[in-house]
Amino acid sequence: MIRRSVLGLGLGIAALLASAGLHAAEPASYFPPPGEWARKAPAELGMDAAALAAAVQYAQGHETERAVDFSDQEATFGSRLGSMPTRRARTNGLVVYKGYVVAEFGDTSFVDPTYSVAKSMLSTVAGVAVREGRIGKLDEAVAKRVNDGGYASPQNAPITWRQHLQQESEWQGSLWGKNADFVGKEQFGAGERKPRTPGAPGSYYEYNDVRINRFALSLLRVFGKPVPEVFQEQVMDVIGASNTWKWVPYNNSYVELNGKQVPSVSGGTRWGGGMWINSWDMARFGYLWLRGGAWNGRQVVPSGYVKEALTPSAHGPDYGYLWWLNTKGKTLPGMPATAFAALGAGSNTILVSPEHDLVIVWRWHGGNVAEFGKRVIAAIR
């Protein structure tokens, strides 16, 4: 009688929870502690080991043609403003499935530039600014909080934080010796562009590192400290990253702050400098975003911001807040619409597929990101 009553009570509670939209808690996600990351054999997680090995073999067979010593840097991007390493790693990467490392190839500990993957890191810093109230609403004008002359003109005054994040700011001017118009072979190399009359902020998408660097400087202003310090304290230390990464400024990208000269960093390595990092720390960063901006119970990036960041903007390609999206199925053909990626020249890639609980880091490759992703996914049984 007692057993039946207890059973009835249990069923009643279960029904009540179900009616309230509540369910039994999912197993807690694994978060790697600093300095280590648990590995599991593919078969332990229901993966086909042979298929995964074949996917990795595909990745290893697609080494980039970029010069190992960066001797092609200026011809490709224009005159340098910052330093570069003497060499880069060969193609390498990691596959993280359900939180565990199931594959590793190449020299994943080598620290070198990750180019425009740094843009997605700037987006993360902006998310921290939102969390801390340093940015009120993303649709407010940057000029409301940043008064350094960069938004004084009629063209630049209306620019919002969201427009910077979506690369639709149409900011005009020069910064660190580079003009936002990208005109000139010497300054911009093979990436030079034809003159174009700028539109109103928010009306046009253009992938533009000068404008992103202006955005990075604006983040420095609202935090009152260099962006790398914020990124280390609020992101990288929280996720247990190593101390080997560094965000290298240009030689001339210093501003006065509280009577001191402090560095402002870039959102890429087009003109040298930028984020220098290894594959393990890139994987931790990707895993943070796979987990919705949370790490082991701590919400590093607001969940609402993450959702917005992975929503496509009105203009241009499938692009969110400095993340490449796949909602139209064109960025990563054949992969889920929910997949997204941080992409940098080289090529350097962090690929995230929430539908498959998957993070892939693939560096210094000349292959098809979606093809590698699909081959890994095909190994999931």
What spans do the regions from the language model cover?
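Active-site SXXK
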Residues: 48, 99, 113-138, 164, ...
